[in-house]
Design a protein with these regions (language model features):
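Hydrophobic face of amphipathic alpha-helices that form TPR/SEL1-like repeat modules
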Residues: 11-18, 33-34, 45-52, 83-85
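Short helix-capping/linker turns of helical repeat alpha-solenoids
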Residues: 18-23, 36-39, 52-54, 59, ...
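The canonical alpha-helical register within tetratricopeptide repeats
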Residues: 33, 62, 69, 84, ...
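Terminal, low-structured helical/coil segments at or just beyond the last alpha-helical repeat
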Residues: 78-112
Length: 112
């Protein structure tokens, strides 16, 4: 188990360097396989890109969707940020984000 976590950490770092340099497209490319493997940290980072509109169009619904998924995968940061984000969303948008999260999980995080 620790070996897998180490590999995930190294792969996650491959996305963090370009992200911190403002190269969001490369960061997203590096994180996508991890997101699809259920890596909570990568899912959380993807949520932040939607929240901030970094490399993607800013979208609170998709940010909330990925925060839901990351929280379910074990990210405490995602749980905290989700509680903050809902204050900026309508009940309809929250419901849509929850529906999208359920569908994404059913598809094993592919094409979400």
């Amino acid at each position: 188990m620790a070996c897998g976590a180490t590999v995930w950490s190294v792969d996650l770092d491959k996305g963090l360097a370009p992200y911190n340099a403002g190269d969001f497209a490369t960061a997203l490319t590096e994180w996508k396989p991890l997101v699809e493997q259920g890596n909570a940290a990568a899912q959380y980072n993807l949520a932040l890109t939607y929240d901030e509109g970094e490399g993607v169009i800013q979208d609170n619904v998709y940010a909330h969707m990925w925060l839901n998924i990351a929280a379910a995968s074990g990210s405490e940061q995602a749980r905290s940020n989700k509680d903050i984000l809902v204050k900026q969303m309508t009940p309809q948008d929250i419901s849509k984000a929850q529906d999208l999260a359920r569908e994404c999980v059913k598809k094993n995080y592919k094409d979400c």
